[in-house]
Every structure is written in C-alpha cells, then in structure tokens.
Amino acid sequence: MFDLEYQLKNLPDKPGVYLMKNNLGEIIYVGKAKILKNRVRQYFQKSQKHSEKVKAMVKNIEEFEYIITDSEIEALILECNLIKKYRPKYNILLKDDKHYPFIKVTLAEDFPRVVSTRKVTKDGSKYFGPYVDGSSVKDIIELIKKTFPIRTCKKNIVEGAKAIRPCLNYQIGLCKAPCAQYIKKSEYREIIDDVIKLLSGKHLDIVENFKLNMEKAAENLEFEKAAMLRDKINIIEKIGEKQKIILNNFDNEDYISLYSDGKDTCFQVFFLRNGKIVGREHFIIEDTFDTNSSTLISNFLKEFYGGTAYIPKTIYVPSIEDEALLEQWLTLKKESKSTIKIPIKGEKKNILVLVEKNAKTTLENFKLKYLQEKALYDNVLKDLKNILRLQEEPIRIEAFDISNIQGFDSVGSMVVFEKGRAKPSDYRRFKINTVKGADDYKSMKEILTRRFQHGLSEIKSIQDRKLEFSSGKFSVFPDLILMDGGKGQINIALEVLNTFNIDIPVCGMVKDNKHRTRGLIYNGEEIIINKYGSVMKFITRVQDEVHRFAISYHRSLRGKNSFHSLLDDIPNIGEKRKKDLLFNFKSIDNIKKATYEELLSIPSMDKKSAECVLEFFK
C-alpha cells in the first residue's frame, strides 16, 4: 500500500520529474521540479493557495512516482517526453499536435525544386513558413510553377550529366529542361533567386523587373510576350497578397497570447515570417479555472513546441514562468539560439494586444456555438430517456451493424456517440471469423460477444494494474445499445449481455419499406417518434453513421481482395518484389516464362525468391 506521508518525507533534494496517479494507477499529471521535495510537498500543503484545477487534481491523487535527473533542463526534456507519452488528464494537451507545412527550395541540388514539406532539416535547403493553411502552400507552389520555368520532377539532375529527353512541361514552356542540359546551372539559379525573393516578401522588385520587360515587349510589338508577362505580374501580386505585411523588420517570430474567462482559456498564435503573417492558430483548453497566465503560457509553450516542426528565432509572450529554462530548452531543440521576449511597449506589444483580442473573440464564439449545441444535445438525450423510460440519460450510446454482399467478407461495425456527439476515436471494426455465408444474426452475436469479452478482460487488467485505464479500447460500457434492426437483432444482443451478466438497455432502430428510419423498438414494443423532431433526427444520424462505417470497411476489404494476385501466394514474394516483377515483366505470363537468370536480374530479387517463383510456376 502507498504510504503518502512516508513518501513525502523521503522526497530527494534534487531536480527531477514527478508523476501523479489516481486510484486506478492512471497517470493524471506530469510535472518537473528544480527540487523535488519542495515542489511535490506543495500540492499537499493546505496553506498553499492552489487554483481550482490543482485542487481538483489533488483530490484524485492516490500515489506518485518520481524520476531524479542531473539538471533542471534534463527534467524539462523528460517532462515533455512523458506528457507526450501518457497524455495526462490535468496537463495542458493540444488536440492538434501537427507539423505545419513549409515551402522548401532544394538549394543543395544543382537544379533546385520548390516543394511542400512538414519537416525542417539541415539539408542545405531554404525553408519558408510555417503555413497554417495547407491549401495555401499548394496554391503558392502552383502559382510559382506557372510563373517561373522550374523543374517539378524528382530526378537527380546534375550539370554536365548525360542528357535525357525532356518531358511535356518543356514543350509547353513550364520548364527549361535541365534534364536535357538545355540550361546552365548559373542561369537556372537566377530563376531560383527570383523565387526566393518572392517567398521572402520582395515581390515588388520582381514585379518592377517584369513590368520593364513587358513595356519593352510592347514597344517591339511582341504583344503575345507582353500579355504573358502581364499575366505573370498578376500571379506574383496574388502571391504577395496572400501574406499581409505588418512589420518592417525581417525576423522569424511567433506571437503568443491568451484569454481566459475564469473557466476555459483560448491560446492564439500568430506566425510572422519575414515581416508577414503567414498564418495563425488557436487552441482552446478547458477547465483552466484561475490558473495564472504565466503558468498557462509556460505549459502551453512546452506542449506546442514539443510537437511542432519549427521553432522561430524569437517568441513574444505577455508573461511567462521559467523563462530562462524554456529558452535553454528551445535552443537545444532548434540547435540555434531562440529567445523569449516580453514586450512592454511599441510595435511588438501592439501585436500581442491584437493576438489577445483574437483569442477573446475566438473563445466567445466557441462558447456560443458550444452552448447552443450542448443545449440541443442535452434536450435530445433527455427526450430519449423519457421516451424509453430509462433511469438515466444515455450519455454513451453504442450502435452496431453488419455488412455483407452475397455472404462474402461479412464485417461488423460499432460507432459511439457521447453526449450526443459522434466519437470516431472509439469506433471499432470487426471482421467476422466464425460465420460462413450471409447470417446477420450469428455475425452480430460474434461481434457483440467479442466487444464485451474484450471489455471485461480489459476491466480486469485495469483492476490488476496490468493496463492503464486510458489504454483500454473496450473497457467503457455504453448506457444504451442501438441495433440496426428489429426484434431479432435485439434478442441477439440481450442473449449476449445475459451470458456476461451485463445489464444495458437495448433498443432497435427500424426502417420503413423505403429504407427510412421509422421508429424504435424497446421492450418488445415499437415506439412511434415524431419524424420531424430532434430525437428522430438523432436516431437517423446514428443509423446512417453505423451503416456508413460498416459499408466503408466492407469496401476496403473488397478493394484489397480485388488486387489479389497469383504472386501474393508465392513464398518470399512481398509487395516490393511483386511490384518489381510486374513492372519489369509486364504480365504474369511473362513471369511464368522467365528464366532463373532473368528473375535474378531484378534488383529486389535474391536466389531464394527466384527459386520460389520457378517452383511455384513449375
């Protein structure tokens, strides 16, 4: 048994990381400390003025662990890694831990390309971004390709190498064909320099140059060339308009601020690159209550830059905790100096005020929409409870369906709705293993048995501390089961539940002769529901969703089967070798006729795999 008092007395006087756990052994909070004994003890001292969030967390702490580190920076790095691994309930967690897209100019190549990427590496390329809007990156690259005759192929083209035949892009004037050695490296680099100028915000210089050339072309009566240059000027100006200039300097900077309403907090981030806003992003964190802004921003930075691909040169914030330590951590991650600054006045301060205003507006709009949706869903669940005469509102609803075509590839699906909203992360698919042919009842019995068998097994593992509560895929049981069918399907579900001594209400969703949702069957009776009411709309949505999910899984299995080849049945022939054989020999018949030497001439083939092919077609 965990002795809290004893463990608190024996905490070390060293830096490290502490992990708070609840009565299920689940990690609910990860923190770092300069001195472990001071930091951890603070949580359990009544004299401390804790925030509401910390008070709620402390009530749930059953035990804790700690890991000693050599320094505070090591503790910070370990803290970030453990938060990412365990996703604890009381840490700030960003739902969207994504890498933003960048525009990459591959300067390490003799003839560089302009591509989109989500990884920034030290490979000699020049990167522009990040861009929050992925479609914006795609649009800019497409506009660049229309304006500048640069290559788009992935070939390794070196100046002075053997010339190859140019592709269609050369024929239509979209590429200078470096592959055919039609342009020198130095001449091509001049084009790339213009692209870099454009992406760096110096598009006015390029426009001016194009205008001079357009005027010369018009004077020489080269009207077609002048029109082409005019179109390119329009494209360049369009790219320039996609990014609003708000600063005169050309640093890479992020501006981060927040707005709290006493319960929840919205963080807003503005990305400035070369003096231009290239994007902004917001994150809403619930139940922050009265946690102070400095702590919130410090925790947000750890989560945000722990997952994003790019750390800028300077980060501006209104206030922050552990500023020097976070700067050290960011610099280590970036592998070059990164600074956190708190502007007091001037242009930078004005931008932070603007960011905070955006955060306030975003949170208010979110709350308005959320409250409207919550009221709607609350009413639906309340009405559903009353219609079915349930003891409690069905917070978690699971719906099941079977899909098959002519008895082949029967599959089952389970969709989940929590508080009236679909929860795709809890959806599950089942491939039917024990039933041959089209038997929906037996198939349904199989998937329900597997669902609740897994659930009971996981619950036991959680109770035995062999599995964390958050790791269970089936351990949370529903308040209501909806079957896509009538009395037969309901009886199957009740039979399975009785086998496991589980008491969950089961309801059937029935359709009319036009395959439209008609009503519900519960306790052997059909309940007619107002077809224009919110409950009917909700039931129809659930029924459509479970059917869609089952059909999509069925299609994916049929798709895989349709691509089955004789080569799939040959030992030692995987996907790579299969593709290589078909690419080189063009057909199964040609592979059958191939000699041992011809098979070995394929780079991915070895002696054993060649022998397997010959043996198979003998």
UniProtKB/Swiss-Prot annotation:
The keyword GTP-binding does not apply. Pfam families: GIY-YIG (PF01541), HHH_2 (PF12826), UVR (PF02151), UvrC_RNaseH (PF22920), UvrC_RNaseH_dom (PF08459). The keyword Transmembrane helix does not apply. InterPro entries: DisA/LigA_HHH, GIY-YIG_endonuc, GIY-YIG_endonuc_sf, GIY-YIG_UvrC_Cho, RuvA_2-like, UVR_dom, UVR_dom_sf, UvrABC_protein_C. GO terms for molecular function: DNA binding; excinuclease ABC activity. It comes from the Bacteria. Transmembrane segments: none annotated. One of its GO terms (cellular component) is excinuclease repair complex. Residues 204-239 form the UVR domain. One of its GO terms (biological process) is nucleotide-excision repair. Keywords: Cytoplasm, DNA damage, DNA excision, DNA repair, Excision nuclease, SOS response. PROSITE patterns: GIY_YIG, UVR, UVRC. It is found in: Cytoplasm. Residues 13-92 form the GIY-YIG domain. PANTHER family: UVRABC SYSTEM PROTEIN C, UVRC/OXIDOREDUCTASE. NCBIfam families: PRK00558.1-5, uvrC. Belongs to the UvrC family. Interacts with UvrB in an incision complex. The UvrABC repair system catalyzes the recognition and processing of DNA lesions. UvrC both incises the 5' and 3' sides of the lesion. The N-terminal half is responsible for the 3' incision and the C-terminal half is responsible for the 5' incision. This is UvrABC system protein C. It comes from Clostridium botulinum (strain Okra / Type B1). The lineage of its organism: Bacteria, Bacillati, Bacillota, Clostridia, Eubacteriales.
